[in-house]
Amino acid sequence: MSKATDEYRRELDELTFSSESKHRMANHIAEAGFIRANLTAMPARRRTSHLAKHPARIALRAALVAAALVIAAGGTGAAMASGVLPLPADLLSDIFDGPACDTEVINRIGRPINTSCTNNGVTVTADAIIGDRNMYTIVYTLTFEDRSTLDRLPAPDANGHVGAFMDGTLYVDGERGAQGSSHIRDLDPTDNTLQYVEQMSVETSSLVGRTARAHLDSIKLMPTGTDEVVNLVTGPWDLKFKFNFEDTSIDIPVPENVDFDGATVKIEEATVSPVGISVRYNINRIAHVDGESGKMSDRAQASLDAISNLPLIVIFKDGRIENGTSRSGFFSVDRKDGTTDVHKTWPFTQICDTDEIASIQIGDTIIDMA
């Protein structure tokens, strides 16, 4: 596993560029159809989705994430074979613009082939997909014809992050729900490229083999103080590629039941991978959310915390800690028996070697992983 993880790090930090290939797509139509479909496709039971409070990443814009939280049936090709109904706009895109670009799997990483789009002097290339059955990370390269455009960016921080974000959407055919965040990095301030990274958690168990559709509108500068958000470059850039990668999930040998503040938690699935940790569980309490005012009250927040703040802590052999207890994103579904199904995920702040994990705490239980 250590060798594979070293390969992940090398692939992410030393990405090679695919050859430029312009794609005319109709995904702006697909996006509109996708949002309209979701407005009428809410399930009878309440499904709640909450974003991770991740300190090291820039969250996707709230309006765009809200549109992607509950995804109606969609897709073509491989998705149709598994019973997922296609959106009409997606069918038009596939008919008139051709099928999705292929993605080959090399060293467990998905590598979209010739998947790029150029507009207004910027080429966006989908370079890599890394993931497991519950989370995925997509890495894009942004190549600027005019290097001076990047002079408007603030200096990168110690991790290479810059004060900019991508305004856009991405969904995968058949995805029932997704949440996540993104960031832009400048790994080499002397060249003409940036790296755009999307980290997402999904409610659907597996999306491998389906079609990913990215509609990226613009690259914006983060506001400072009272400054308004301004565009660095306007697109759009549309890309469509097969969602292929090797599932890197490892099952965590956690007991069937753990305790959380006096509540019984039944663990249905617990996995860890180089990209993060995921737990699906049922807890014998429900959240009482009073959303009439449009604001989250302290009582409602405490009620949500009572179902979602299950301790979720990963300790590495070198002492590093990934703590997703109160900052991770989660999906929840109320059940008629007064319990709640919760799917909680925590994407790691960096790609990790699972062989270097010493222990994992879930609820009141610590599992030795050494």
Regions found by a protein language model. Give the residues of each.
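Alpha-helical, hydrophobic structural elements that either
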Residues: 8-9, 30, 61, 75-370
